[in-house]
A protein has these predicted regions:
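Hydrophobic beta-strand residues in large extracellular and virion-surface proteins
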Residues: 34-36, 49, 61, 76, ...
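LRR N-terminal entry segment and analogous cap-like coil->beta motifs
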Residues: 2-73
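Short, solvent-exposed loop/turn at the beta-strand->alpha-helix junction
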Residues: 13-19, 39-47, 67-74, 94-101, ...
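Leucine-rich solenoid repeat scaffolds
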Residues: 137-182
């Protein structure tokens, strides 16, 4: 059954006061780190976050497992408030290729040094789009795209883009980043 048009499924039935309360509980004392992992804020929670002026100093946003979808990603990527982010963790948000495109073309996320897009149903199409814009992310050092559906075409496009971009750590395969040397 498709619940995509359901207000509750998109988080539209949640009052902004509830989102504000979650932000206050999970915001660091210095106001620079916000961990909203697994709070299931969904699309409208992402919209609320993207418009909170109090989050302008934020440099680190952990927004994994919120199931915000591509429209929620669009709110965050186009936010005029979240322009100081250096780290954005968006694992498991069901963004797909549409969502990754919003990140790729965002002028507001160019300060990112770390971007985690793990487990988001991204395919070659999204990877190739991201690869085209990767050189514009001059501060990006680490890009994590593990556990997606990226095949050789997408991986090769990203590896080629990495050669002219600042990205030092490009994680594409599920075993990368977990290797322990004895």
């Amino acid at each position: 059954m498709d619940y995509s048009g359901n207000k509750a499924a998109m988080g539209q039935d949640r009052p902004i006061s509830e989102t504000e309360s979650m932000v206050k509980m999970n915001l660091s004392k210095d106001g620079k780190t916000l961990d909203l992992t697994a709070t299931y804020l969904k699309e409208y929670g992402a919209k609320d976050i993207s418009q909170m002026e109090s989050l302008r100093p934020l440099t680190n946003l952990a927004f994994g497992t919120n199931l915000c979808g591509p429209k929620g990603v669009k709110w965050l990527a186009q936010s005029k408030v979240l322009v100081n982010l250096t780290s954005l963790n968006m694992f498991y948000n069901k963004m797909g290729n549409e969502g990754v495109k919003y990140i790729a073309v965002s002028d507001n996320l160019l300060s990112l040094q770390n971007l985690v897009l793990t487990d988001n149903e991204i395919t070659d199409e999204g990877a190739i789009t991201l690869a085209k814009f990767l050189p514009l992310f001059t501060n990006l050092v680490r890009l994590d795209l593990r556990l997606n559906r990226i095949k050789d075409d997408g991986k090769n496009a990203l590896k080629e883009a990495q050669k002219i971009a600042a990205v030092k750590h490009l994680l594409l395969d599920k075993v990368e980043g977990f290797q322990v040397k004895s």
